[in-house]
């Protein structure tokens, strides 16, 4: 069994669902995952509106709206994909694997949508996210990523976010 710890499938799912397609994982990705013997995924919630991303077409949406949309698309895909099971722990992943299904951890890649509303971290947790990166490549209210000023690092708000995420 192979675990793909950083999968951008949710990005593709969301892009296609917003264009009117459904059953994206089943129709476009399941056979590739089987062929590659992928038994587990780390699905990234990435909603940064880069100019070359499909999110640029939704420039009127803030980061949290994009996050909610991606989660709605993910939930719809789960309903269409009984072979894919979201998990929160390694024990759950082993159970799903033993049942012959594919497990998926949810990860947040860049927390720009949190802004200064740290209660949104709890919403990520309710959705099942157990992995969170404060930045993608950008600089946001929590921290400076690879594309930000290296002198800025983790902000005070970012420190509080880390404390909350460790609970």
What are these regions (language model features)?
Residues 161-167:
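Substrate-binding cleft of carbohydrate-active enzyme catalytic domains
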Residues 1-156, 160:
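N-terminal hydrophobic targeting/anchoring segments and the immediately downstream early-domain regions
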């Amino acid at each position: 069994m192979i675990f793909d710890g950083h999968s951008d499938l949710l990005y593709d799912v969301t892009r296609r669902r917003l264009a009117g397609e459904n059953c994206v994982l089943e129709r476009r990705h399941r056979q590739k995952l089987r062929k590659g013997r992928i038994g587990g995924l780390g699905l990234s919630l990435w909603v940064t509106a880069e100019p070359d991303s499909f999110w640029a077409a939704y420039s009127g949406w803030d980061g949290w709206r994009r996050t909610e949309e991606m989660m709605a698309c993910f939930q719809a895909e789960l309903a269409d994909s009984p072979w894919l099971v979201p998990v929160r722990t390694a024990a759950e992943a082993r159970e799903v694997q033993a049942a012959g299904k594919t497990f998926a951890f949810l990860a947040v890649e860049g927390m720009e949508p949190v802004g200064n509303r740290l209660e949104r971290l709890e919403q990520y947790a309710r959705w099942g996210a157990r992995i969170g990166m404060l930045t993608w490549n950008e600089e946001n209210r929590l921290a400076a990523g690879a594309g930000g000023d290296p002198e800025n690092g983790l902000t005070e708000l970012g420190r509080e976010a880390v404390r909350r995420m460790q609970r």
